[in-house]
Regions:
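Cytoplasmic/organellar membrane-interface segments at the starts of transmembrane helices
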Residues: 370-376, 429-494
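Hydrophobic transmembrane alpha-helices and their helix-loop junctions in integral membrane proteins
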Residues: 94-112, 118-137, 147-399, 403-434
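Core segments of transmembrane alpha-helices
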Residues: 89, 251, 397, 460-462
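Short phosphate-coordinating micro-motif centered on Lys-Gly-acidic
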Residues: 142
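Hydrophobic alpha-helical membrane-insertion segments
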Residues: 37-51, 173-182, 382, 463-477
Length: 494
């Protein structure tokens, strides 16, 4: 086995090895958290080295257990998977740092279980990122669902259990009824489940492809396209580090990553643009963008507002994939990274506010920015990135998505994306504005001693906010990975 293949497998195995260390150190919080941080650092090192190897032109793949002829556990590194794995590994480190401050500051129980499930989830993310076929993708997709269920129900309350049932029910139902059926249909029709540049279907299989496309889009429930989005707001009962994991690092990104990969490597854009079901799904995704934004405006609970914002932003990426042109794929790939940093910043800030002030409702946060200036400033920066305004990195991904709608002659969708950005302004910017400029009703009351969240959490949210700015000033690495993805998928210049 070559060293590159060993590194590939280690990216999946290192988080699992961390599980053993976390359990062994369960009675010693400092050691337990050191194990988690160390594993995250090792994962970043491995992922970055794989990035360098593939940039030099080396093909890295590994085939393992073969279930049936043509159906094997297969990993293959390509640019979109690298982009996803780099984001996942880096944000695992930052989220672990944040969790140390949050879990201790909030005096959460079962912290060892939390770190164990988190590590298993990250291992699943690496498996999804490097999956070389639909079979491998499906296995790790399901492991990710099951490993995050205990995180959603972490509090152990009836509300948490109900949220967990909705979470598990929707994600397992969609994946088994639709996604698994789509994979079987692909294998039967095309004779393969491997991801291939240009897709696996030919023109004679257009009808079958048109039937299978909705099964994939609805079956990948983690992409949260309406009406299969309810699991996402239901999961907001989880601790904030879990919400950050769900919305930025792992679960939803696994969803839209899978949608983008299926559209490019299973259908191919030449065929995708000809399918009658593509048009329907494209406008359904556009409707999800607007409807979720409107629902977000009505939420007073901060995490609920951010949850519906996530539903809307994920549909941007689905729109990019279904537009079936290179600008859409480029914008969708870049938005995976841009949204990750913007949204994780917002959730980190929401958690910091809850730990420091015990406030969860936006209407109670007037004047809070004067006592938590770093947190509220970070929230402002994250908001700009989600909206798509400088100096937020989301500016660039939304730019390419707008270009894609023009190139595809979908002016209605261009208006939808513009209207959504205006709605983003309406439901995000008033929060820091009121936090800094409105009078603080508790300035002389019982809450006058409220200050910033614990230092580890404050460092984490500051780093992700800085990341939003860095991705605006220096988007080249993300852009280059996205363009390499276009080349690998045979889309460059399309």
């Amino acid at each position: 086995m070559r060293s590159s293949e060993t590194m590939l497998l280690l990216t999946i195995l290192v988080p699992l090895a961390a599980v053993i260390g976390i359990v062994a150190a369960g009675r010693y919080p400092n050691l337990r958290e050191a194990v988690s941080l160390s594993a995250a650092l090792v994962l970043i090192y491995l992922t970055y080295n794989l990035y360098r190897l593939t940039e030099s032109g080396l093909t890295v793949s590994w085939e393992g257990l073969q279930i049936l002829p043509g159906l094997a556990l297969f990993f293959n590194i390509e640019p979109l998977g690298l982009l996803f794995s780099l984001i996942g590994s880096f944000l695992w480190l930052i989220t672990t740092l944040y969790a140390i401050g949050y879990m201790r500051g909030h005096q959460e129980e079962n912290q060892t279980r939390f770190y164990v499930c988190f590590a298993i989830a990250i291992s699943s993310v690496m498996g999804i990122a490097y999956a070389g076929n639909l079979f491998t993708l499906f296995i790790f997709y399901e492991i990710l669902t099951l490993s995050t269920y205990p995180l959603v129900t972490h509090a152990g309350t009836e509300k948490a259990k109900l949220g967990g049932r909705v979470y598990l029910g929707i994600l397992l139902t969609t994946s088994i009824l639709f996604l698994l059926l789509a994979i079987i249909g692909t294998w039967y029709t095309a004779g393969t489940v491997d991801f291939r540049a240009g897709g696996v279907f030919d023109q004679s299989q257009k009808f079958a492809a048109a039937v299978l496309l909705p099964l994939y889009i609805f079956g990948i429930g983690k992409a949260a396209i309406m009406p299969f989005h309810r699991w996402l707001p239901a999961a907001m009962v989880a601790p904030t580090p879990v919400s950050a994991l769900l919305h930025a690092v792992a679960v939803v990104k696994a969803g839209v990553f899978s949608v983008l990969k299926v559209c490019t490597y299973i259908f191919g854009f030449d065929l995708l643009g000809q399918l009658p079901t593509t048009e329907f799904l494209l406008y359904l995704a556009g409707a999800s963008v607007i409807i979720a934004s409107l629902v977000a405006m009505r939420q007073d609970n901060l995490k609920a507002r951010l949850a519906y914002s996530t539903v809307s932003q994920l549909s941007y990426i689905t729109v990019g994939a279904l537009l079936a042109n290179s600008a859409g794929a480029l914008g969708g790939a870049m938005h995976i990274g841009m949204h990750a940093f913007g949204k994780i910043t917002l959730f980190f800030c929401a958690g910091a506010i809850m730990v420091a002030s015990h406030k969860t409702e936006i209407s109670d946060m007037h004047g809070l920015g004067r006592r938590m200036p770093v947190t509220m400033a970070a929230f402002f920066i994250g908001s700009l990135s989600i909206i798509g305004l400088p100096p937020g990195g989301g500016t660039w991904s939304k730019w390419y998505l707008m270009i894609a709608t023009i190139e595809a002659d979908k002016l209605i969708l261009m208006v939808v994306l513009m209207a959504s950005s205006l709605l983003n302004i309406a439901y995000l910017l008033p929060i820091p504005i009121k936090g800094f400029l409105y009078p603080d009703p508790d300035a002389q009351g019982a809450d006058k001693k409220v200050r910033e969240a614990p230092l580890p959490s404050l460092i984490a949210l500051s780093l992700t906010a800085l990341g939003c700015i860095v991705l605006f000033v220096y988007p080249q690495p993300l852009y280059e990975l996205a363009t390499h993805f276009l080349e690998a998928a045979g889309l460059h210049g399309r």
